[in-house]
Amino acid sequence: MMSVNKKILDRLVVGLVGGAHAEAWWNSPNRAFDMKTPNELMTEETWTEVRDYLMHHAYGGGS
């Protein structure tokens, strides 16, 4: 299930940071996630935090 969710969310990541930087985004600590990587949050319980973050920024949300 999580690989399906990540595959869907990866489309947003590529749209936001570009294909060349997508993997780095997934593996870099992020202040929005208390310095955890987005990959660390791709669990059944917390993957929606990553989804919500990406959707917010995809629709032009600020910081």
Question: What are the roles of these predicted feature ranges?
Answer:
Residues M1-S63:
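Non-transmembrane "mature" sequence context
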